[in-house]
UniProtKB/Swiss-Prot annotation:
Domain GATase cobBQ-type: 262-459
Cross-referenced Pfam families: CbiA (PF01656), GATase_3 (PF07685)
Pathway: Cofactor biosynthesis; adenosylcobalamin biosynthesis
Any Gene Ontology biological process: cobalamin biosynthetic process
Keyword Endoplasmic reticulum carried by entry: no
Encoding gene, per UniProt annotation: cobQ
Reported function: Catalyzes amidations at positions B, D, E, and G on adenosylcobyrinic A,C-diamide. NH(2) groups are provided by glutamine, and one molecule of ATP is hydrogenolyzed for each amidation.
Catalytic residues of the enzyme: C343 (nucleophile), H451
Provenance organism: Prochlorococcus marinus subsp. pastoris (strain CCMP1986 / NIES-2087 / MED4)
Protein name: Cobyric acid synthase
Keywords annotated in UniProt: Cobalamin biosynthesis, Glutamine amidotransferase
InterPro entries: Class_I_gatase-like (IPR029062), CobQ/CobB/MinD/ParA_Nub-bd_dom (IPR002586), CobQ_GATase1 (IPR033949), CobQ_synth (IPR004459), GATase_3 (IPR011698), P-loop_NTPase (IPR027417)
PROSITE patterns tied to this protein: GATASE_COBBQ
Amino acid sequence: MELIEKLQPIKKPLMVLGTSSGAGKSLTVTAIGRILKNSGEEPIPFKGQNMSNNAWVDWNGGEMAFSQALQAFACGIIPSSEMNPILLKPQGNSTSEVIHLGKSKGITTAKDYYKDWFFPGWGVIKKSLNSIYERYPNCRLIIEGAGSPVEMNLIHRDLTNLRVAKYLNANCILVTDIERGGVFAQIIGTLELMKPDERKLIKGILINRFRGDLSLFEEGKKWIENKTKIPVLGIIPWLDDKFPPEDSLDLLEKKSSLTNPELKVGIIKLPSISNFSDFDPLENEESILIKWVMESQNLNQYDFLIIPGSKQTIKDQKFLRDSGLSEDIKNYSTNKGNIFGICGGLQMLGTILEDPFFKEGSKINCEKSINGIGLLPLKTTFFQKKITRQINSESIWPQVTEINGFEIHNGVTELDNSQDTFKIKPIFKDLDLGWYKENIQGGTIAGTYIHGIFENDDWRDHYLNLIRKGKNLPLLKKRTRSYKMKRENIIDNLANEFKKNFNISSLLN
């Protein structure tokens, strides 16, 4: 299904393709964006289609992948869903929610998606590209591919790799991860499967995550260049990046080097976990060790627990119930435990979840109603309408301070008047954004709909100090660097490493 029309931007777009998923495409685009921004250019990130439950909400309430939002920050611009016009949010059982230009278009199976959604998807991608170039006529687009560009069973319906490269006549770089092994076969195999006109677009090869002495790979570099007639433009050393991973499989590979933490945080690894970027500010705290909880266990080793967001809340609550974790969490709460739920995690902390329209899944695989963990007297009902919006509010607990973040959820949560609601109190001035309850035994149970809550430095410090006080630890003092400043520093360091080890100038012509 060849589409040969082409767009002709003023500045040559760059495209980052990979030999596989996890090769380093996202970080490469992030680094290039910051390098070009610092050089005075106007870079704009773009990924035609992304599959991720790690999402962001733009200024217009549109959903987009968090990785493209992060790339926009690196480029020094405000994220917009046009930078990621198609977002697929996996729901399990080979189904995904389809997001076009930030808005949900429904749920489909993988088979039906490839059959029915190709032309609408390509139209959305072209519309987004035209819109970006109308708004930023002198920009340089930095495009990210997805997975491998040569999945031969899907290539005729691949919306986001070589089709985009040919449409824009982009200068492409092929990135491969040497740490996983098989780098020579990955490079040669990928190039051999391309058509001649596609292979001509590949202007360079980038070796990512090299450990050890770079000089030891000099012969390998020469072999690749002699075999492919394409220059190896860079060898990036292994970097201890602190960015949140793009999917939940990579999530478990993140290792902490912290050996003597002051606080130990347990995060429940839900089967349908979403928005795990919520915990990036905690990962960047020097005194906190994060552990992922995946099975029933004694939770008293943790100073506080987090129940994260979920793409399928009822299904994940069923997992907590059937695995025994729901009972473990209740037992933890009676031992001065501190528990915090975000979005779906807040819903699960309540007494009941009802899904009259089966918004949480199919009628076969999903329960219409299920009891929650029961630690907060809250009832959640899932309706047809999905709420996506940015939040600017003010907290009243644990301290009065300004709050920013965003909401992405189905479901409306309200007090369950069949329960004792006397002890539950609102966290924010906008009363429906979150609640908390202090345990008689000590500790607090709290939850919010606000994603990005821990990015709010003052709020995070006061919440952590509440826990530190209960552990007789010294309270945190007012910090000199915000989380967002740390994130900017991480992006700068990433860009500096790429600039030292990657000849980007040859791609700009």
